[in-house]
Amino acid sequence: MKKYTQADFDAFEVIDGIKQCPSGDYSDIQIFGERCSFGKWCSFGEWCSFGKGCSFGECCSFGKCCSFGRACSFGRACSFGE
């Protein structure tokens, strides 16, 4: 699984106001803005923060104490705080 840095994340393409984020390991990044769309099997570290309107593919995993803005959506089999 590709591990992304903040610089990688900042460079991702934005289409119709939505940042397109491929599948991968985002555990080194803690703060994500609004309207990000993540692929399947993404992995996030502890204490990460997501703005409103983010969407996550199937089987994404989130560390402890992550926070989510309103209207975020999650694919099936996502796990939280594990």
List the predicted regions and their residue ranges.
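Thr-biased low-complexity repeat/linker tracts and other Thr-enriched repetitive architectures
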Residues: 34-82
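Extended, small-residue-rich solenoid/repeat segments and analogous flexible loops
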Residues: 1-40
